[in-house]
A protein has these predicted regions:
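An acidic, glycine-rich "communication" segment
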Residues: 11-13, 17-96
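Solvent-exposed, acidic/flexible segments
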Residues: 3, 26, 128-132
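Extracellular ligand-binding/catalytic regions of CAZymes and related secreted enzymes
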Residues: 84, 88, 96, 104-108, ...
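Short alpha-beta junction capping motif
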Residues: 1-24, 103-112
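Subset of Sec-pathway N-terminal targeting signals
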Residues: 64, 102-103
Length: 145
């Protein structure tokens, strides 16, 4: 928390033990990290598994995602979170944040609530021509003050 408040950057990426995770074992709720995330972490198992695939939707433009088309490949799951009042949710899946941003103190944070590697992020997502650009844009935004 203090690192972000003093000007640092933080991103939390989805997975089995991030956010709340499997059987709520992630335990990021009510932590110093949650205080500087743009989302609230649930206190229960937050995994939203969709083996059939579910389509992300761009709901708001954000400079970090500039040049990324609105038609994103499907993901197979994500960690369900609740956006904070001051969050900028750029991409949703089933009405939940997939990519969200926030500024806290002198720093910034972001969440990417699906996997960044194959499991919830299938090969079609990870091999998408804009996948690297998403990460570069998020990293640039997080580190530009």
């Amino acid at each position: 928390r203090d690192y972000v408040l003093e000007g640092g950057s933080l991103i939390m990426v989805g997975g089995y033990l991030t956010f709340s995770g499997v059987d709520a074992k992630g335990k990021w709720h009510d932590t110093a990290v949650q205080e500087v995330l743009p989302v609230e972490v649930l206190t229960v198992d937050d995994r939203m598994e969709h083996c059939e695939g579910v389509k992300p939707h761009v709901v708001r433009e954000h400079e970090a995602l500039s040049g990324i088309p609105e038609d994103w490949p499907e993901v197979l799951g994500y960690n369900r979170t609740i956006p904070r009042e001051d969050a900028v949710v750029a991409v949703e899946v089933e009405g939940d944040p997939l990519v969200a941003f926030g500024s806290y103190g002198k720093g910034r944070s972001a969440v990417f609530t699906t996997d960044c590697a194959p499991h919830w992020a299938p090969p079609e997502f990870c091999e998408w021509e804009y996948y690297d650009k998403i990460w570069q844009g998020i990293a640039d935004w997080l580190t530009t003050k």
